[in-house]
A protein has these predicted regions:
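OB-fold and OB-like single-stranded nucleic-acid-recognition modules
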Residues: 1-199
Length: 199
């Protein structure tokens, strides 16, 4: 769902709620002011009986009293963050859910809910898929504390795609949706391909 945001509606600009199963052991990611952060993958079910494998970034402060292990069912709240990383001498925009709260698994919660309030930083790109579905690619700048911003790609479908395709750069919008993963094959030579994941 896409809506125009107004100042009176201003609340949390970046909110993620997920429930699923831990499928990788926590691996060290980085350290900030002596605090260690770890990368974990969460398997989140879809209604279509498939699932998404979503990247999490978790502070050691959270796992002290809530250790994570493969096969564990959890719920969480956090924010969708972006960062640039050098891969093969190219800068890539990577996404991860920055976990702010770990919770016991709760089947009553929505397993995958994302709410963003930000600004369009590129002109929306409207297109039709090979399956004749209308979609619109967006890039949203979501502000956070200390003057930083996260740059979040999003896809609007159907009626929402037609609604947002003419919005101007700089337009503030509120997005409610899901975080999904999609594997694709990237050709790296005439005979070799590499499997990558987009979010």
């Amino acid at each position: 769902m896409f809506t125009y945001a107004t100042k009176s509606e201003k609340e949390e600009t970046n909110s993620v709620s997920l429930s699923g199963e831990i499928v990788t052991e926590p691996t060290f990611s980085h350290e900030v002011f002596g605090e260690s952060f770890f990368d974990v993958k969460l398997k989140v079910p879809r209604l279509s009986q498939t699932f998404d494998l979503l990247p999490l970034t978790v502070s050691e402060r959270l796992t002290c009293n809530f250790p994570l292990f493969v096969g564990q069912q959890i719920s969480l709240r956090g924010q969708l963050r972006s960062f640039n990383k050098q891969v093969d001498n190219k800068s890539r925009l990577l996404l991860s859910v920055f976990v702010r709260e770990l919770l016991p698994y709760d089947s009553a919660l929505s397993p995958n809910d994302v709410q963003l309030d930000g600004f369009l930083c590129k002109q929306p790109v409207f297109r039709t898929t090979p399956f004749n579905r209308e979609i619109c690619d967006l890039l949203l700048a979501v502000n956070r504390a200390y003057g930083k911003s996260d740059y979040i790609p999003a896809i609007a479908w159907g009626r929402n795609a037609r609604f947002v395709k003419f919005l101007p750069v700089g337009q503030e919008v509120k997005i409610i949706g899901r975080l999904q993963s999609r594997e694709y094959q990237k050709k790296i030579s005439e005979v070799e391909t590499e499997t990558k994941t987009a979010y």
